[in-house]
UniProtKB/Swiss-Prot annotation:
The lineage of its organism: Bacteria, Pseudomonadati, Pseudomonadota, Alphaproteobacteria, Hyphomicrobiales. Its main location: cytoplasm. This is Urease accessory protein UreF 2. It comes from the Bacteria. Keywords: Chaperone, Cytoplasm, Nickel insertion. Belongs to the UreF family. It comes from Brucella abortus (strain 2308). GO terms for cellular component: cytoplasm. GO terms for molecular function: nickel cation binding. InterPro entries: UreF, UreF_sf.
Length: 243
């Protein structure tokens, strides 16, 4: 009888966490229909300029992009997640505008608002949450830009996913976007990209600890090469991706 009770308790605990895990898998999936496959996070230009040309330079590019995202969009995600849980709509608009203003080039701005709007449309349709529906109306009426990290923070808050896991899903998305694009743009194998992904995901927990308590005023990104590559990409004649 004791053994049976313990087993049931273990299962109950596992079942309570299972929905959150599945929500993470769904909203962290690169196949989520919000247009992420159309963007390469600057990889296309990096390859054209021969800055990325083999698996080692691809690894360095991926880790750099994740680090940059952690201190910019990652902080935005966490602050938006906290604001959503507090139903602080004024704070959400401040965060959203701050994200948009820190995107220095046309392509990164296009990427964040296009994916952000698509994600909010999806969330408002499939999650029973008033804040997500109201946020979509704010985007449609141009009251707020509707950036991706803010929309992601709102979705995960509505699904009761905690901030640490939400940050992990975002970082995973950055890595898989780049590595998925790499398979279409350069000579690299699935084995190579999976090895890079395994290493990259091991950096997420330390990155979270560094920015867990950061506020929107701490959001920063210094990656001039990324901005230069984006500018080059805008004028490119042959492009597979939108950025």
């Amino acid at each position: 009888m004791t053994m049976r009770t313990a087993t049931i308790t273990e299962f109950s605990s596992s079942y309570r966490s299972l929905p959150g895990l599945l929500h993470l898998l769904q909203f962290g999936d690169s196949a989520l229909p919000i247009g992420g496959f159309s963007f390469s996070n600057g990889l296309e230009s990096a390859i054209q300029q021969n800055l990325v040309h083999d698996k080692e330079t691809l690894r360095e590019f991926t880790l750099t992009a994740m680090n940059q995202a952690a201190t910019s969009d990652g902080i935005a995600l966490l602050t938006a997640h906290r604001a959503a849980r507090a139903d602080d709509r004024g704070a959400l608009q401040v965060i959203d505008k701050a994200v948009f203003e820190r995107k220095l080039n046309e392509e990164t701005r296009l990427m964040t608002v296009r994916m952000g709007r698509k994600l909010c449309e999806l969330s408002a349709s499939i999650i029973d949450d008033r804040l997500n529906r109201d946020w979509l109306e704010c985007i449609k009426t141009a009251e707020t830009p509707g950036t991706h990290p803010v929309s992601l923070g709102l979705a995960f808050a509505a699904l009761d996913v905690d901030g640490r896991d939400a940050f992990g899903a975002q970082q995973y998305g950055v890595a898989t976007t780049i590595l998925g694009a790499a398979l279409r743009l350069m000579r690299v194998s699935f084995m190579d990209t999976q090895k890079i992904l395994l290493e990259a995901t091991s950096t997420v927990a330390p990155a979270y600890e560094e920015i867990a308590d950061a506020g929107i005023e701490d959001m920063a990104s210094f990656a001039p090469m990324v901005d230069i590559l984006a500018a080059v990409h805008v004028k490119g004649h042959v492009r597979m991706f939108m950025n």
